[in-house]
């Protein structure tokens, strides 16, 4: 058989595959446009994460870390799952949690399925309590955690923590803030349960400070999509959430600082270091097609349904409309 005889069927097969993929993408876009996940209450956040956990798609593609990766500065070519693990270690070092003595207690607010909590317990010898509003995430976190690892998990609302004041040596929270309708209350609860001298580590998706540059018409549309597609009531800016932390009544103890003395919070922008995560989140489905196809047609559709939001997130962070803020502080002793 000549090469010319082979080309037409091969070309036809590729065109057919492209047509199928195109149709699936259009179907995913239709679902994306027709049915959003607009924030209504904490129950809507819990429901969204229960569904994301129960369908297993995120875990099969991303492993046990439902957060962005850290690719170095400048960003390097790193395996997506490796970058997620590296992120935990980078934030632990930057915030000072890595310097805590073994046995120190840590609260992980918005723990997902426990990936960060297990690293903090296993690699740093810390005692970790992970909390999430999603019962599905907590069930999965418990199932993935070895019995001999010093990790516990509980269903709890981050805006009404059922925990005593000053009960943890450190508080850790990664990418939970966008789901909080009351940013000041969120900051207050993080600091309320932190012991005097305790360390705070927060990482979040933030919007550009509107006082520096308001959103233009295109950015307002993109921002609306980023809010309604993933159950976000609002994004704080980096300086805005820093003020929430510094102005909290729990930022200082009665004996440590006189009234009006600020509790200083350090911040940094890790947008560049985490930016490759958004495209990798999509490419991971191509690298591991069996992980998606093995879950059936609905998983394929749901993967396609998330693609537009991932692309908009990449655009937002690449253009500076969004920023990946990290926050650290040490509560006055």
What are these regions (language model features)?
Residues 7-59:
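N-terminal auxiliary segments of SAM/dcSAM-dependent transferases
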Residues 81-102:
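Conserved alpha-helix/loop element of class I SAM-dependent methyltransferases that forms part
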Residues 107, 113-160:
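Class I SAM-dependent methyltransferase SAM/SAH-binding core
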Residues 159-170:
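A short acidic, Gly/Pro-enriched loop at the edge of an enzyme's catalytic core
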Residues 170-182:
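A short SAM/SAH-binding and catalytic strip from SAM-dependent methyltransferases
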Residues 184-199:
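A short glycine-rich, Lys/Arg-flanked "PGG" loop and its adjoining helix->strand segment in the class I
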Residues 202-204:
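Acidic carboxylate diad motif detector
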Residues 214-300, 305-321:
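Substrate-binding/catalytic lobe of Class I Rossmann-like enzymes that use SAM or dcSAM, i.e.
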């Amino acid at each position: 058989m000549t090469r010319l005889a082979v080309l037409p069927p091969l070309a036809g097969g590729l065109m057919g595959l492209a047509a199928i993929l195109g149709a699936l993408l259009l179907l995913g876009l239709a679902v994306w446009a027709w049915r959003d996940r607009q924030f209504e209450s904490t129950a809507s956040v819990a429901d969204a994460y229960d569904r994301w956990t129960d369908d297993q798609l995120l875990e099969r593609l991303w492993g046990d870390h439902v957060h962005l990766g850290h690719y170095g500065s400048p960003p390097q070519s790193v395996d997506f799952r490796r970058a997620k693990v590296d992120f935990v270690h980078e934030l632990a070092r930057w915030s000072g949690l890595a310097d805590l003595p073994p046995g120190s207690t840590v609260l992980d607010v918005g723990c997902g399925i426990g990936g960060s909590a297990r690293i903090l317990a296993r690699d740093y010898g810390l005692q970790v309590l992970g909390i999430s509003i999603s019962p599905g995430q907590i069930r999965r976190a418990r199932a993935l955690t070895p019995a001999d690892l010093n990790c516990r998990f509980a269903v709890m609302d981050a805006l009404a923590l059922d925990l005593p004041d000053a009960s943890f040596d450190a508080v850790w929270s990664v990418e939970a803030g966008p789901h909080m309708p009351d940013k000041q209350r969120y900051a207050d609860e993080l600091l309320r349960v932190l012991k005097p001298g305790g360390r705070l580590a927060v990482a979040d998706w933030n919007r550009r400070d509107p006082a520096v540059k308001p959103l233009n018409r295109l950015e307002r549309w993109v921002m609306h999509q980023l809010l309604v597609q993933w159950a976000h009531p609002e994004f704080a800016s980096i300086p805005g959430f820093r003020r929430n932390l510094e102005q909290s009544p729990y930022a200082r103890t009665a004996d440590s600082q006189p009234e009006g003395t600020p509790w200083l919070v350090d911040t940094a922008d890790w947008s560049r270091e985490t930016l490759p995560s958004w495209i990798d989140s999509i490419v991971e489905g191509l690298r591991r097609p069996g992980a998606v196809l093995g879950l059936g047609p609905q998983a394929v559709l749901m993967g396609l349904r998330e693609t537009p939001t991932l692309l908009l997130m990449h655009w937002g962070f690449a253009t500076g409309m969004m920023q990946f803020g990290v926050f650290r502080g040490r509560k006055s002793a």
